[in-house]
Amino acid sequence: MSRWTKKRIDEAFTALVTEHGYEDVTAAMIMEKADVSKTTFYRYFRNKADVMDYHYRSLYDAAFENENCKTLEDLFTLLFRTTREHPEELSLFDTIGYDSYREFIYNYTYRRGKQIIETAWGRPLTEREDFNIAYFCGGGARILEEWACGRYSGMTPEEAGAAAAKIIHGRYQVPIIKK
């Protein structure tokens, strides 16, 4: 039941954000569209930002788990493609603060990047290596936002993914090892 209920809430969230923009969507609107009670909604999510996090974490996790995602270039290409294929993301970039979409993108890419590198190297990152990953992901989150908003529209996701991968120092160019 929980997977089905979360899926309904997620689908309602996506439809409402596409129609109204993120800022104008409320938890009450999501509950009404998903046809779930307040108790049910809050059993799974704290607020609409939590639904946003669930939605995009699921979306990006699915891209990452894709069998064609073997290199960082593949991963960057998938991120750019996924962002371009989901125009509802545009209004999410208007959010600010702790629960903002920008913060989600940074945190997600940082955690995922750190996991990829540590898995490939078979050890935890040093403080300097962690700094490098965090710095790259901060800039990468900003570029992903600009990409979603139409900047660099002359580039395909493949071209953008290749360009992003070329920026990375050679020692960080690792294969993606899935567990």
Q: Which residues make up each language-model segment?
A:
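Regular secondary-structure segments
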Residues: T14-V17, Y60, F64, R84, ...
